[in-house]
Amino acid sequence: MSLKVNVHVRDQMYSIFCGPGSQKVRWLSDVALHRYEHFNNGSDPGLAKGMRFETGVLIDMEWTISDKLENDVHVWVILKED
């Protein structure tokens, strides 16, 4: 099964396909921040200090995606500047 996670950075949302989801959650934030920069004319969003669920519950950046996140879930990147 291939997992898809919807990652929000500021006012943008990126669907990230993770394959079997063996990556760490930190990888999701890295991919989302690179996409944000690419699609916003090089605008640097800054560094991620964490991620959270829609409920506000924090996500451990060292979790393995497939162990803790469900397919098609929405998560938000928390930026150091926020």
Where are these regions (language model features)?
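Eukaryotic basic, amphipathic alpha-helical target segments in cytosolic regions
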Residues: Y36-N40
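Short structural boundary motif marking the start of a folded domain
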Residues: M1-V5
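Short, contiguous acidic and Ser/Thr-rich linear segments
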Residues: H8-V31
